[in-house]
Every structure is written in structure tokens, then in C-alpha cells.
């Protein structure tokens, strides 16, 4: 019997063993996921083949990016099926065509800005686009900043600084936008999502979250958002209930409408998560979840040996919407 998650209008069936990889291939950590206009699923991962493409049924189509990326982190796709690949290993954002051709690079590979300088980039994490095509970059691990660029990569402005007050950040981990131009920032270690206008003016914050890591706008007017939350990051509360890892669905004002998983901590079983790090939605409303279960294993499970399946394909899950 398939495992289901969620409630009401937000119920999902767990599709086990969805990704059909070529023999001998592994995904390792899946940092982020995106879906194009043809419902092809792009899986940005930290294995030997950084970008692997599947169809909706999980059949392998192709791979690219070998030798290009330092460390996969964020992935965003625009209305023209261009992919914005954020690499926190070499401190760049690359705009790529669906065949992997690099169309634009923002940042200088392997030349990070000084730590917490506010200058772009020091381990940037994700991108989002304004309705006009302007590029927002969350930055990230070595900065506490959001940068705004023209569509051709010229810096317009930046905002944010370390801290916990409105407009301050403690690991700017993900970023999203809606059709009205509002900017939503996953402020991970402050346990919140902050909302800004397109010029960085603070508007609101969403609380009652636990280490929000993935952030996806579902589109349309007054959209819902899917938030991937990490579990506890400290050994002292490892295994505590009701802290994730999980997915939370909220409305356009941040009010929770559904929660998927996370009641009893992380796990390999169907219906459980390891470390949701990237989320995408296809045209049928199905959810694809990329997880960093390899990197996060020791944080979640201590000295328990990591099963080989975690590094093969367990860090990618599909949740099929029940209509």
C-alpha cells in the first residue's frame, strides 16, 4: 500500500524508487531540482554527473555539467527553460541552456569575496527572477546578503547583514519571487522566511519554521509556497519529535495549510525525509524533493553507519499529488 502524506487538498502519494539511473551511477546529495515546460526534471547533484535529466516517469534522458561545477547548490528555471545554476563551491551563478551550454556567468570562479564583506559572492546559495527578468542571488554561507542584477548580470544593489533583526540574515539559504515581484528569502538559522519588495525593503516575516532550507513558489496569483525544513542541527536535540525534516506548505501570507512528514525525525522509510534541500513542482502538481542526506547524515544519525542506498538515489524523492 503506497504511503501518503499531507491532508485535505494537499495529499501526496510517495513514489518509491522513482529515478532510474544508468548502471553504476549515483546521485550522492541532490542539492536542488527544477522542472521545465515539458515536465523534464533537472536534478542538480554532487555526484560525478552534476546535472541529470529525467522524464516525469523517472526515465533517464541525459546528463551534463561534468567538470563544470565545483559544488552544486541551487537551481532555478525561467519561463524560457534557461537554468540558473548556483555553485557555492566556486562562488558563481551560471545561466545555462537545457543542453548545458553556459550563456552567462556571474561571479569569478574560485575567487570568493572576503568573508562577510557583503560583496558578491562568498558561497552563494540560490537564485530567483523578478517579473522583469532581474536576477536575485542569495549569498549565502560566507555572506549575509541578497544581490540584485540586471538580466545580463550587472549588479544593481545589495541588501542584508549578519544578525537576527528584520532585514538581517543568518545563512541566506534560498530565495524565491512571485508574479507581483515580492522577494522571499529563506533565513535558515533564524528559522524564518523574510519577505521584501523588489528593492529590498522589508515587508514581513514568516515564523513557526525549523531551519527553512528549500523554498518554492507554486505560481499564480496569491500563490502557495513549499518550504523544505531541515531537522535539528545539534546532537543534544537529535531525534526530537516535531522538528522535521519535513515539507510545509503555506499560503501567500505565510499561514500553514499543510505539513508533510517530520513528526518523528529523519529516516529512510517511505514517507520520511533526510534533509530537504531543494523542491520543485511539475504541471500536474507533483513535488520533487532533493535532499542532502549524505552531507547531513552525521548531523542526523551520529555514528550510525550510512547505508549505501543514501548515496545512490535515496536523496531524490517524488511525491505524486492525489487528485
Where are these regions (language model features)?
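Eukaryotic scaffold repeat domains enriched in small/polar residues
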Residues: 1-323
Amino acid at each position: 500500500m503506497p504511503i501518503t502524506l499531507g491532508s485535505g487538498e494537499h495529499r501526496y502519494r510517495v513514489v518509491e524508487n522513482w529515478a532510474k539511473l544508468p548502471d553504476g551511477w549515483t546521485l550522492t546529495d541532490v542539492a536542488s531540482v527544477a522542472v521545465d515546460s515539458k515536465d523534464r526534471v533537472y536534478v542538480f547533484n554532487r555526484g560525478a554527473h552534476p546535472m541529470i535529466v529525467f522524464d516525469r516517469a523517472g526515465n533517464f534522458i541525459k546528463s551534463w555539467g561534468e567538470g563544470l561545477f565545483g559544488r552544486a547548490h541551487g537551481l532555478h528555471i525561467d519561463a524560457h527553460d534557461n537554468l540558473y545554476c548556483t555553485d557555492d563551491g566556486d562562488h558563481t551563478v551560471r545561466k545555462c541552456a537545457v543542453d548545458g551550454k553556459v550563456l552567462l556567468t556571474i561571479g569569478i570562479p574560485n575567487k570568493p569575496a572576503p568573508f562577510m564583506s557583503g560583496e558578491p559572492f562568498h558561497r552563494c546559495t540560490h537564485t530567483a527572477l523578478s517579473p522583469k527578468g532581474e536576477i536575485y542571488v542569495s549569498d549565502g554561507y560566507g555572506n549575509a546578503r541578497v544581490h540584485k542584477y540586471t538580466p545580463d548580470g550587472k549588479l544593481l544593489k545589495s541588501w542584508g547583514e549578519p544578525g537576527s533583526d528584520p532585514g538581517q540574515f543568518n545563512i541566506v539559504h534560498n530565495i524565491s519571487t512571485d508574479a507581483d515581484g515580492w522577494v522571499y528569502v529563506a533565513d535558515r538559522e533564524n528559522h524564518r522566511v523574510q519577505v521584501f519588495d523588489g528593492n529590498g525593503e522589508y515587508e514581513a516575516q514568516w515564523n513557526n519554521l525549523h531551519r527553512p532550507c528549500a523554498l518554492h513558489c507554486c505560481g499564480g496569483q496569491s500563490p502557495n509556497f513549499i518550504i523544505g525544513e531541515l531537522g535539528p542541527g545539534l546532537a543534544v536535540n537529535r531525534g526530537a519529535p516535531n522538528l522535521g525534516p519535513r515539507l510545509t506548505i503555506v499560503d501567500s501570507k505565510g499561514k500553514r495549510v499543510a505539513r508533510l512528514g517530520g513528526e518523528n525525525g529523519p529516516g529512510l522509510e517511505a514517507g520520511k525525509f533526510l534533509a530537504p534541500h531543494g523542491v520543485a513542482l511539475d504541471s500536474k502538481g507533483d513535488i520533487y524533493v532533493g535532499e542532502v542526506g549524505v552531507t547531513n547524515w552525521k548531523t542526523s544519525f551520529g555514528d550510525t553507519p550510512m547505508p549505501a542506498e543514501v548515496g545512490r538515489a535515496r536523496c531524490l524523492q517524488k511525491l505524486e499529488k492525489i487528485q
